[in-house]
From Swiss-Prot:
Gene Ontology biological-process annotations: translation
Record keywords: Ribonucleoprotein, Ribosomal protein, RNA-binding, rRNA-binding
Name of the protein in its database record: Large ribosomal subunit protein bL21
Gene designation: rplU
Ribonucleoprotein keyword on record: yes
Family, similarity comment: Belongs to the bacterial ribosomal protein bL21 family.
InterPro entries, sorted: bL21-like, bL21-like_sf, Ribosomal_bL21
Coiled coil: none
An example Gene Ontology molecular-function term: rRNA binding
Length: 102
């Protein structure tokens, strides 16, 4: 069984036991959270929401809170010798999917 969930402005296809890297969600490592923005549940019978499925939820356990890889942004102006490099590390949460209810 799989589900398509929406969190942090993005959509993820998840199955039970998957490790998923998502935008930061508040909570401590080991906490269990419920993701109730489920767009679709598939398996033997496919259910598609309009846009969300009422009563469907995905439960997950927080495995890690941290930062993603650094993204470098380089600015320059031609012929002027102006060069700047900026870096950004997005805060992320790693989840392990423990259950899907439809």
């Amino acid at each position: 069984m799989y589900a398509v969930i929406k969190t942090g402005g993005k959509q993820y296809k998840v199955s039970e036991g998957d490790l998923v890297k998502i935008e930061k969600i508040e909570g401590a490592v080991g906490d269990t959270i419920e993701l109730d923005e489920v767009l679709m549940v598939g398996g033997e019978e496919v259910k598609i929401g309009t846009p969300l499925l009422p009563g469907a939820k995905v439960t997950a356990r927080i495995v890690q809170q941290g930062k993603d890889k650094k993204v470098l942004v380089f600015h320059s102006k031609r012929r002027k010798g102006y060069r700047k490099t900026y870096g950004h590390r997005q805060p992320i949460t790693r989840l392990q999917i423990t259950g899907i209810e439809a």
